[in-house]
């Protein structure tokens, strides 16, 4: 596992087309923004596990939705 340190507003690149930006830190929560091509699925781990089990349908464009869990 690669471990990186980033400050609020800083970004890291995954390959040539995915960016992950630290948007904010509050207590033990970190808000991140992810920019990825539409053909790259981005899910929180618990949602990904549900999809793998077949418990949750894969929504079209789900990685572009708003995660309003603050």
Swiss-Prot record:
Region (Disordered), start-end ranges: 51-70
Q: Would you tell me the protein name for this molecule?
A: Translational regulator CsrA
Q: What task does this protein carry out?
A: A key translational regulator that binds mRNA to regulate translation initiation and/or mRNA stability. Mediates global changes in gene expression, shifting from rapid growth to stress survival by linking envelope stress, the stringent response and the catabolite repression systems. Usually binds in the 5'-UTR; binding at or near the Shine-Dalgarno sequence prevents ribosome-binding, repressing translation, binding elsewhere in the 5'-UTR can activate translation and/or stabilize the mRNA. Its function is antagonized by small RNA(s).
Q: How does it assemble?
A: Homodimer; the beta-strands of each monomer intercalate to form a hydrophobic core, while the alpha-helices form wings that extend away from the core.
Give GO terms: molecular function aspect only.
mRNA 5'-UTR binding
GO CC, any one term: cytosol
InterPro entries noted in UniProt: CsrA (IPR003751), CsrA_sf (IPR036107)
Give the organism, scientific name.
Xanthomonas oryzae pv. oryzae (strain KACC10331 / KXO85)
Q: Which UniProt keywords apply?
A: Activator, Cytoplasm, Repressor, RNA-binding, Translation regulation
Q: Is RNA-binding among the key words of this record?
A: yes
Origin superkingdom: Bacteria
Q: Which Pfam families match?
A: CsrA
Gene Ontology terms describing biological process: mRNA catabolic process; negative regulation of translational initiation; positive regulation of translational initiation; regulation of carbohydrate metabolic process
Q: Does the keyword Repressor apply?
A: yes
Which locations, inside or outside the cell, does it occupy?
A: Cytoplasm
Supply the PANTHER family for this chain: CARBON STORAGE REGULATOR
Per the record, the similarity remark reads: Belongs to the CsrA/RsmA family.
Gene that produces this protein: csrA
Note the Gene3D superfamilies from the entry. Translational regulator CsrA
